[in-house]
Amino acid sequence: MKFNNGKSMKYLRIFFASIISFLFFISCSDIREDIPISAPKITLHKDGIKNPASPNFHGKLVSNANWDMKQCQQCHAANYNGGTAESSCYNCHKTPGGPEACNTCHGDFANTLRIAPPRALNGNILSSDRGVGAHTKHLYDNKIGKVVSCNQCHIEPASGFSDPSHIDNTPGAEIVFGSLSKLQTNVSGGFNYQSSLGNFVPNPGFDVSDGSCSNTYCHGYFKNGNLDNIVLFTAQSQGAACGTCHGNAATGNPLPKTPSQGGSHPPSLNCQQCHGDVVENNNGNYTIVNKEKHINGKLNVFDNEFEF
């Protein structure tokens, strides 16, 4: 295009300048307006983080981190109330202690009174599993003896969940025997003390290879008891069958050692004659009638309890 005079060129320049100014004005107006933004959702966890059946379940992540909850606290706060993630762990972990409650990792997640396996750390609920074993029999549903507390076999953490006695770098739960398993019998001044027999001083042991207990008062290491009794933690009902702790395990005869066997118990099978508060004998069928008075560290004779 050719322009023959300066006036036409001037008008053309004014025209283009007007268009540019108009476009600039429109652009500035658009920029000054709020632009709707759809912020992308940022997620740290993979799908299935709340699903126990998922490989991405957060319980598995904590297990893989050797039960270190600090990684959770980085986003959910030290008290698990939400933190920067703005998602409180107490939405699901509703019991006192939240994620650090005893029944979170082992026991019944729905029942704060059942803090020991089952469930075991591996999720198993069968008593034939090493992690489950006889926990229920010892702590909750003992039909033949007084129930015990956790500290009779384990150290209870003094400073909370992360206490070194609870969370450490060694796999499995440490067995630290309490006072009941170490109870001495035939002590001087006790009921029917026999100086010739000496003191019976248990030296409790736990065999990690097979999960067995030995030399414990609770399973036979007492005066007139079966000192060499070894019981598997997974033995189920056979671990406490009549005759295992005192008497003859093969026949089920519960008669403790008599003088002819190196003991001091009278050779009588009429248990209830002397121990009526504890046991009944109906035609050879022995039934514990008061479990609170059996395996409780005392000798119950004629409705009275004695040190022995």
Which residues does each PLM region occupy?
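Sec-dependent bacterial lipoprotein signal peptides
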Residues: 1-26
